């Protein structure tokens, strides 16, 4: 292999050779590009991060949608949607780098009459005072992952949360072992992350096995906060009582369109190494996620 400033020359054992042009590293990032569910007539602006790009052009916009692309951002407006209708389609952007092959960026857009997002980020908190008297999500993160005062209270205060005035989703600890504590299951707000599988145990039960490369946080798309589910039904002897669940606190039926899920460090360690209750996952094993509404 011979490399110069512009090409890579590859010579095979039989003497055959071919030349590959050298490309230049380039960047075309759309911030929050996974958030593509819109409410009727909603306009959303996505900030762009670019480097070594000659041109970026919108080459496909779904019918009824509008989109404007410039050097700094992408602005998308959804069509009008009524009733239970759904307007969806694929938006495409042709990106032409300075010294590399171009590529097509795709975004799957979807619009419904009304959409709300539960992010667990403090800036998105819209409810009244929570169980500890604060108007944010972070105050619901326990100071200890196991045995903390919020999830394992010494008084009768029941751990609960509600996304009032937004998605209206809510949850509280079930009576798993008769005492409404997290060892009986529940949905706990967290911002813990841990990439060390030797910490994959109940002492680190609120940590996710994921860290965003840009923000250093453990939530989806680089966000800081998230919700940790704990609770199961099997014959191990360690499951008892009702399973935890999330519901609409105002009693109105709605559709949960999607959610983003990752493994906790506890689960990742069980899959990789096993523990006292389960063997490590083999090549023919699988992990199945089922959501019932």
Named regions from a protein language model:
Residues 73-90:
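Extracellular/luminal low-complexity segments enriched in Ser/Thr/Pro
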Residues 114-243, 251:
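N-terminal targeting leaders for non-cytosolic proteins
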């Amino acid at each position: 292999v011979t490399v110069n400033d512009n090409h890579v020359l590859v010579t095979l054992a039989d003497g055959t050779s071919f030349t590959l042009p050298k490309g230049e590293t380039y960047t075309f990032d759309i911030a929050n590009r996974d958030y593509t569910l819109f409410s009727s007539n909603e306009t959303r602006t996505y900030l762009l991060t670019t480097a070594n790009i000659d041109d970026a052009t919108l080459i496909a916009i779904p019918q009824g949608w509008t989109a404007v692309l410039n050097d700094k951002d992408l602005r998308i407006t959804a069509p009008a949607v009524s009733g239970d209708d759904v307007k969806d389609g694929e938006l495409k952007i042709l990106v032409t780098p300075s010294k590399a092959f171009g590529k097509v960026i795709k975004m799957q857009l979807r619009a419904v009459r009304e959409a709300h997002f539960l992010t667990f980020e403090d800036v998105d908190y819209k409810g009244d005072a929570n169980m500890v008297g604060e108007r944010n999500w972070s105050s619901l993160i326990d100071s200890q992952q196991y045995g903390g005062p919020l999830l394992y209270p010494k008084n009768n205060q029941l751990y609960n949360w509600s996304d009032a005035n937004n998605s209206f989703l809510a949850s509280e600890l079930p009576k798993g072992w008769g005492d409404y504590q997290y060892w009986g299951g529940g949905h706990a707000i967290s911002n813990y992350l841990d990439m060390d599988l030797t910490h994959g145990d109940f002492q680190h039960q609120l940590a996710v096995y994921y860290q965003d490369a840009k923000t250093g946080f453990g939530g989806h798309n680089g966000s800081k906060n998230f919700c940790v589910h704990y609770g199961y039904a099997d014959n191990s002897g360690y499951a008892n009582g009702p399973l935890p669940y999330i519901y609409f606190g105002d009693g109105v039926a709605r559709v949960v369109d999607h959610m983003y899920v990752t493994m906790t460090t506890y689960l990742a360690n069980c899959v990789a190494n096993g523990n006292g209750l389960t063997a490590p996952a083999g090549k023919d094993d699988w992990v199945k996620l089922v959501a019932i509404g």
